[in-house]
Amino acid sequence: MPKTNLSPAITYLAIPPSGQGPGVLVVHAWWGLNDFFRGLCDRLAGEGFVAAAPDLYEGRVATTPEEAKRLRGLPKREPTNQTLLRAIVELRANPAVVGPNIGVIGFSMGGHWALWLAQQPGLPLGATVTYYGARAGDYGNSQAPCLGHFAETDEWVSPASLKKLRKSLEAAGRVADFHTYPGTGHWFAETDRTDVYDSQAAELAWSRTVAFLRRQLRPPEL
């Protein structure tokens, strides 16, 4: 990990009422670190996790795809992958975090990055969750089981890309549990995307996510 003089990578941190818990890194979609993703960290804290979110857009947020495309292309103080790697180090070192490994949850663009992190050697990842984000590659270095939530109709994630992801995970012998939610589209789990939000599918995906994280991360004594 290269040393930098940058500010901390973690922008938003939510601690559970108990004051400690397994760590979970939340990687936002291309909208930026908006109220939904901050609220997601709070929900995770309410479930007993220490949830942390880096701001990959350095304070900027988008509400339309056009704005999001522009923000995604703007110059950054450091590459996104380095920000995420620093965030993992910071979260793992937080005294509120218990257990040897942390989890990562990513949405859309963030899901793509969560799967990139899952491919990197030597990271303390014990669980990977992707919401409608797919990324094929070499998962031979991954030790983290994967949970995926996907829309039935998705103009951003093709059936071919999802098939490639499945094959990549299978080739590496990784455990993967994928769910497709009928009648949904991309961003179906995000409450602020009112045109596509599906409350029933979102709550089912949430309950599966929490159960998965507890199973993979929670030490027996907690």
What is each stretch, according to the model?
Residues 1-222:
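N-terminal cap/leader regions of alpha/beta-hydrolase-fold enzymes
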